[in-house]
């Protein structure tokens, strides 16, 4: 069939460019190591440096207990969307908790839960582009960092607003774009922590531009909530920001160890999202038990255990940074210094990055090789992520294995 032939040709092109994505099946809970399927063999235990469970909470007994108790109390499914009959007291409690956490940074804060971070980001950008009832967003411009997450990019596309992409964290370029913009409604959109580079957005400077040019500042804090700021409150706390024009998106599938997301903003902006956010209105609400689990995670994050886990993670980051700097200098890779759990090593081309990841897996270590279109062409990388669940020995084992893989690759290149 011609349609299948077209698909086959497209898949062949993906293979030729070393860009095929594959799924791996895990047979055990998310932790520092997991039993993972091995092509052509039996599943085996592999030490992971590729997940987003930054505090090691995904399999925490307190979270599992909270989810179980929530299911016994509220059942499994929500049964409907939030605006029909699916909004549980468990959702309401979680929203109140998130609003309280961000209240020092967003005056008159309210919150709204979403099923995923992707849905939250798409909703906020597309709905806020229509603020004031402009449909489509004919008098709105979205200003988006070049390295923003795909969900923010898709939200801008869905909004049908004008979109201006500014070079990564280039404040001068953004200022020039804002100065030249005649739109009544302006949205500055950014990751808080950039997911592939690990750097933190210059939010104080971005907020100053938002104030100067009367724009909203939308911050996706997927990788900051639980890790950055006082008591893990996130990137707004990290910088000590406060403004009515801030819209904060925190996701629960990373440091919080669960699933879902929450938007925190001025109560009027949240009410607007209830009226206009399509990914909130037209989908079944997250199971209430999940909200119970996330609330338990927030308890841990705010307490002594959360502080201890953040301190352990910070120690791992410092230890790994020393190794990464040394290895990058030796093998000609690009080390991207990051104060976060995301620790990229840019290799360059796709094939060498894949080969290094494969060599690590042969040693029982799993690291993701990230390639275009997720990252720009020529910047394929090993996206190494650290967790409080790791041990110091785990960090040393990764360093030894990567050094051996780099040496082998370097020797092969010299012999060719």
From Swiss-Prot:
Natural source organism: Ralstonia nicotianae (strain ATCC BAA-1114 / GMI1000) (Ralstonia solanacearum)
Family: Belongs to the class-II pyridoxal-phosphate-dependent aminotransferase family. BioF subfamily.
UniProt keyword annotations, A-Z: Biotin biosynthesis, Pyridoxal phosphate, Transferase
Family matches, as InterPro entries: Aminotransferase_I/II_large, AON_synthase_class-II, AONS_Archaea/Proteobacteria, AONS_Proteobacteria, PyrdxlP-dep_Trfase, PyrdxlP-dep_Trfase_major, PyrdxlP-dep_Trfase_small
Lineage: Bacteria, Pseudomonadati, Pseudomonadota, Betaproteobacteria, Burkholderiales
Keyword match Ribonucleoprotein: no
EC number: 2.3.1.47
Keyword presence, Transferase: yes
Name of protein: 8-amino-7-oxononanoate synthase
Annotated function: Catalyzes the decarboxylative condensation of pimeloyl-[acyl-carrier protein] and L-alanine to produce 8-amino-7-oxononanoate (AON), [acyl-carrier protein], and carbon dioxide.
PANTHER family documented for this protein: 8-AMINO-7-OXONONANOATE SYNTHASE, CLASS II AMINOTRANSFERASE/8-AMINO-7-OXONONANOATE SYNTHASE
Catalysed reactions, semicolon-separated: 6-carboxyhexanoyl-[ACP] + L-alanine + H(+) = (8S)-8-amino-7-oxononanoate + holo-[ACP] + CO2
Domain of life (superkingdom): Bacteria
Residues at which substrate binds: 21, 149, 374
Cofactor(s) recorded in Swiss-Prot or TrEMBL: pyridoxal 5'-phosphate
